[in-house]
């Protein structure tokens, strides 16, 4: 009888353990993002950041947006799970540029460079890198504005909340060109930009920014570009 009881108890314990293990695994899987596996010879984001200027770099990342294609080149804003990349004038056919929709994974080879504080990949070439997709959510960088930690998120898709519009000006005083947007937070001014090659005059964001007035309070989304300091390339604006 004791032997039968022991066997029953053992079976019950095994079933309990299996149930617990299955439940834990399902919970972990639901919480964790899909693995962003790099191909052989491809740098992690940390390795890219640590690479010397002017050295060759090879990265894999996901297209978040790109500027207008021209002269067989396209400038791409890309991001992986760990950081973001500004890929300047990537060699690309017009047909391939049309395939660079948000989320598309690409492998890029080029040289790490810097211009006015903006770290970028120069002279890049690329190839498509499989079917995996990823579109980043906007990182709320409001609390980092004006701090040394902000640059750690350079080129990421970010949002700044509760900014006050100080001024709106068109490049060369020509509506239809870039829009220079001066915003403030806690008494400090920052220069943002609507890049016409990223969001052209026919886009909703270009029209919305054109109509803003000094004193308006807004939330701003965009890519954390750098030009002698933060110079976010605006992709969305919400007036409060």
Show the residue positions of the predicted features:
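N-terminal alpha-helical "arm" segments
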Residues: 7, 24-25
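C-terminal motif of bacterial Sec signal peptides marking the signal peptidase cleavage site
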Residues: 16-19
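Positively charged n-region of N-terminal signal peptides that target proteins for export
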Residues: 1-8
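Repetitive helical segments and hydrophobic/amphipathic motifs
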Residues: 11-12
């Amino acid at each position: 009888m004791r032997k039968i009881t022991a066997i029953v108890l053992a079976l019950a314990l095994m079933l309990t353990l299996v149930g617990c293990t299955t439940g834990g695994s399902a919970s972990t899987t639901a919480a964790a993002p899909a693995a962003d596996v790099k191909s052989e010879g491809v740098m992690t984001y940390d390795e890219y950041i640590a690479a010397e200027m002017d050295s060759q770099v090879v990265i894999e990342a996901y297209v978040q947006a790109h500027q207008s294609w021209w002269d067989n080149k396209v400038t791409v804003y890309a991001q992986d799970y760990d950081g973001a990349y500004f890929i300047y004038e990537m060699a690309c056919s017009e047909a391939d540029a049309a395939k660079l929709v948000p989320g598309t994974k690409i492998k890029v080879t080029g040289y790490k460079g810097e211009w006015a504080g903006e770290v970028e990949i120069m002279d890049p070439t690329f190839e498509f890198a499989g079917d995996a997709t990823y579109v980043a959510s906007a990182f709320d960088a409001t609390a980092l504005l004006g701090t040394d930690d902000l640059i750690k998120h350079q080129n990421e898709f970010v949002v700044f909340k509760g900014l006050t519009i100080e001024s709106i000006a068109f490049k060369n005083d020509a509506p239809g060109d870039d829009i220079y947007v001066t915003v403030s937070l806690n008494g400090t001014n920052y220069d943002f930009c609507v890049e016409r090659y990223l969001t052209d005059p026919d886009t909703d964001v270009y029209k919305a920014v054109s109509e803003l007035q000094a004193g308006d309070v807004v939330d701003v989304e965009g890519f954390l570009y750098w030009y002698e300091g933060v110079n976010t390339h605006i992709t969305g604006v919400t007036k409060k």
